[in-house]
């Protein structure tokens, strides 16, 4: 059961709350409130009634007959202003195991080159001399004035230098060195152009020339010998082996050098030389 002090305290709280909602109360409402308060003090309460008939006091909802203005529309707004809850759902971050996508740049656009143009630019020739100058050949030296000299060491003269000449290009000087090296050392020589040996092999050419010369000389000697024999036979037949003058004329026709080179004949030879009669041996 509530005591009078508790009832008065509740009433003051109700007054405080409801008066705050109406900042400009009317005089009629204040008079009614005062009359109710005085009647509440005069009548009093019996504590036995509170025990038998308990009542529930609504402090939030005011009575419509006491207040002229509408409070229902303002109380929810006040409650809404005083009690506001913000519900922010937690963010769930899910880390995926997928790799980031690769960034592949598209290929460049194909450019077509037009070869047939109106004014084609003349192409400059590639200098070949520069490449030849950079290469070093065996036995070749470059002179300060731009020409090339070829030299070789002669093994038969204790390695003395043999001058081969001065050439316009390094290739010509290298070929001159190769020819001389092959002539001195043969197949043991180290050459700049070993594949060109067959073109300028001096020994092969000299051997062929000597063989041909000897062959021609042998044919000429055979012809001369046949002619000499025929001449001697004719002279012998005409003279009959007794005319000395015919033999002398035949000797005059021969060359003196050929006569001296002939071999000596024996007296026992069946052929009488130079028209003399054959000697008989007893």
UniProtKB/Swiss-Prot annotation:
What keywords are assigned to this protein? Activator, DNA-binding, Ethylene signaling pathway, Nucleus, Plant defense, Transcription, Transcription regulation
Q: Name one GO biological process term.
A: response to reactive oxygen species
Locate the region Disordered: 77-100
Per its UniProt record, what Gene3D superfamilies does this chain match? AP2/ERF domain
Provide the GO MF annotations for this entry: DNA-binding transcription factor activity; transcription cis-regulatory region binding
Q: What does this protein do?
A: Probably acts as a transcriptional activator. Binds to the GCC-box pathogenesis-related promoter element. May be involved in the regulation of gene expression by stress factors and by components of stress signal transduction pathways.
Full protein name: Ethylene-responsive transcription factor 6
Provenance organism:
Arabidopsis thaliana (Mouse-ear cress)
| Source organism phylogeny | Eukaryota, Viridiplantae, Streptophyta, Embryophyta, Tracheophyta
């Amino acid at each position: 059961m509530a005591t009078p002090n508790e009832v008065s305290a509740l009433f003051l709280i109700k007054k405080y709350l409801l008066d705050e909602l109406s900042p400009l109360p009317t005089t009629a409402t204040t008079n009614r409130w005062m009359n109710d308060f005085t009647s509440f003090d005069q009548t009093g309460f019996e504590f036995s009634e509170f025990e038998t008939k308990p009542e529930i006091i609504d402090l939030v909802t005011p009575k419509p007959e006491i207040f002229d203005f509408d409070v229902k529309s303002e109380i929810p707004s006040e409650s809404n202003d005083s009690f506001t809850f913000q519900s922010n759902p937690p963010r769930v971050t899910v880390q995926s195991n997928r790799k980031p996508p690769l960034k592949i740049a598209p290929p460049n656009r194909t450019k077509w080159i037009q070869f047939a143009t109106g004014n084609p630019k003349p192409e400059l020739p590639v200098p070949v001399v520069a490449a030849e100058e950079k290469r070093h050949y065996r036995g070749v030296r470059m002179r300060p004035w731009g020409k090339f000299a070829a030299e070789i060491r002669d093994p038969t003269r204790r390695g003395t230098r043999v001058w081969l000449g001065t050439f316009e290009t390094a290739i010509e000087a290298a070929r001159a060195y190769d020819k001389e090296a092959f002539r001195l050392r043969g197949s043991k020589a180290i050459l700049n152009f070993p594949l060109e040996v067959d073109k300028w092999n001096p020994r092969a050419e000299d051997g062929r020339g000597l063989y041909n010369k000897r062959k021609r000389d042998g044919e000429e000697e055979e012809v001369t010998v046949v002619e000499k024999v025929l001449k001697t036979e004719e002279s012998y037949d005409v003279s009959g082996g007794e005319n000395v003058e015919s033999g002398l004329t035949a000797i005059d026709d021969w060359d003196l050098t050929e006569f001296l080179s002939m071999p000596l004949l024996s007296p026992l030879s069946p052929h009488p030389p130079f028209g003399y009669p054959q000697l008989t041996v007893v």
